[in-house]
Amino acid sequence: GARIETANLALGKRLRAALWAAGGPLVVLDGANVIDPRLIRFLGQQSGSCVAMRGENAARAVALCLDPTVADAIPADATDLRAVADALLATGRVSVLDEAAFPAYIDKLRRSLPYWIYTVSDAATRRTLERQLFWDNYKGSTDLLTRYVYPPLVWPMVRFCTRFGIHPNVVTIVSIILAFAAVPLWADGQWFWGFVCAYGMSVLDSVDGKVARLTLTDSKIGNVLDHGLDQVHPPFWYYAWALGLGATSAADPLYMAAIWLIVFYVADRVVLGIAKRRIGHALHSSTPLDERVRSIIARRNITMTIMAAALLAGAGGPGLIIVTAWQGLTLLWHGARTAWLGFLSPQEMRPEA
């Protein structure tokens, strides 16, 4: 590729020269814009010239994929990419990016989002965009705490991390430490400090991914750490709950409840994995019903809140039984939905071969 540096020549002339020098398609971006990284990748995969646009008038932002064959149609006196895009569109030398072909579904967020590109002209616009991108990075299907309780805590933490350059992997490592620090505390019956660590980890689990996506520092190791933590830690928590309640052998019903809770949890993760392979995406993003049910099913934030409420009521034992039953019902629900959507539904609801 070629980077167009500020020089005495007008943008149009410099862009022409860059295209001729490149000898192949170039993705042309305005460094003053905030651009969806998915859009950059998608433009780089195009075989012909096209333009992506968002906004109107002075707030209109454009990004282009240009083939050297259109260089002669670029106005030599063009001063910005908007003028370049307008001229090329007027002559029919470029087409508008096909929105239907853009991969809008984001697996990590379990939702579809159109591509975004913004012109950042002042501090007020920047603050508005920060808030909008923050909400855009919330999962389409998630639990009640993550959706309604955590945002007032997560938003200032995300801003702090982005402003001071704290890498999301650092946030993930702190959350891992908190997640496993809760285990011996609970096992020792120190419920308060155990839940302080657990809820701290839960909040940070909403922070690291957003920092990564907002600062474009998403990494494979970060994803492995984040998703690995999400899947691995719950069984340790559940076993620690039983120990904290004084259950130390299979002769104790609470001990067996914890064992069954772990079995149900592992089986549930297996079922969800099968569902994703069959459907082609996360089960919870399949239908509005699945999205709504995701807010209350037996996942970490819901189960630990049930347990915390039970302990506050002086009913830790019944609380563990309730959590086990809820995890079992969740497994049955996911099994039924996987059977229907993945195996019994009409052909068009199954993933493409």
Predicted feature locations:
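Short amphipathic alpha-helical coupling elements at transmembrane boundaries
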Residues: W155-T162, G209, R213, N223, ...
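Extended, compositionally biased accessory segments flanking or bridging domains
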Residues: G1-A2
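A feature for the membrane-embedded catalytic helix bundles of lipid/isoprenoid biosynthetic enzymes
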Residues: A58-V158, H227-A353
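Conserved small-residue-rich
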Residues: K139-L185
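Conserved beta-loop-beta/alpha segment of the NTase-like Rossmann-fold superfamily
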Residues: T6-L66
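Membrane-embedded alpha-helical segments that form the functional core of polytopic membrane enzymes
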Residues: P168-I221
